[in-house]
Regions:
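N-terminal accessory segment at the very beginning of proteins
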Residues: 3, 24, 45-54, 98-101, ...
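Predominantly extracellular/luminal regions of secreted and cell-surface proteins
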Residues: 68-90
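Bacterial Sec-dependent N-terminal signal peptides
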Residues: 1-27
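Accessory beta-strand-rich segments of carbohydrate-active enzymes
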Residues: 70-74, 103-176
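Aromatic- and Gly/Pro-rich amphipathic surface segment
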Residues: 84-103
Length: 176
């Protein structure tokens, strides 16, 4: 009888493990039902808004950084976070259900974003620019721990040249 118990216990434990794996929380889901439209269900968190933002000026050598980023809402006085609150779907606003967060930043706080990417291989005479379609009011851009630029202005596009701050392998981009 004891010989049968051990395999039964093992099978039960394996079953519990498999059940936990299949019920794990997804990396992203729509947060709530705020202002839901028919198109919200069509959002693909692996490829959100994949099209080139300015079709008349499309280039062959560009990459889209939209997707799941780390985010943190922290007091304005705090430095770059070491721990983030979760994942946010860029380019959607943190307050939006489509961001997967649906939280307000609140007075006295700021929002931090972080992602990693691999830079395309450039020739010596080319520069690598990060184009931002819009950032609400004020942003500071960091590449690999280096503060590069602070931009002020509501929802106007800007770019940052990151060429001189690239390293081998993955790049870390942080936006405050």
């Amino acid at each position: 009888m004891i010989a049968l118990r051990k395999p039964a216990v093992a099978i039960i434990l394996i079953g519990i493990f498999l059940f936990q794996e299949t019920t794990a929380q997804p990396a992203w889901k729509i947060a709530g039902e705020k202002i839901s439209t028919n198109w919200a269900a069509m959002v693909d968190h692996k490829h959100p808004l994949p099209e080139y933002p300015r079709p008349q000026m499309q280039r062959n050598n560009w990459i889209n950084l939209n997707g799941l980023w780390d985010y943190a809402i922290k007091p304005v006085a705090e430095k770059t976070p070491t721990v983030y609150d979760g994942k946010i779907l860029v380019p959607y606003a943190v307050e939006s259900a489509l961001s997967g967060v649906a939280r307000e930043v609140g007075k006295g706080n700021c929002l931090w974003y972080k992602t990693k990417f691999t830079a395309p291989k450039n020739s010596k005479d080319k520069r690598l620019l990060l184009h931002f379609g819009a950032v609400d009011w004020q942003s500071t851009i960091y590449i690999n721990g280096n503060e590069l630029n602070t931009h002020k202005g509501g929802y106007d596009p800007f770019y940052v040249d990151i060429t001189d701050h690239l390293k081998k392998g993955q790049q870390e981009l942080v936006v405050r």
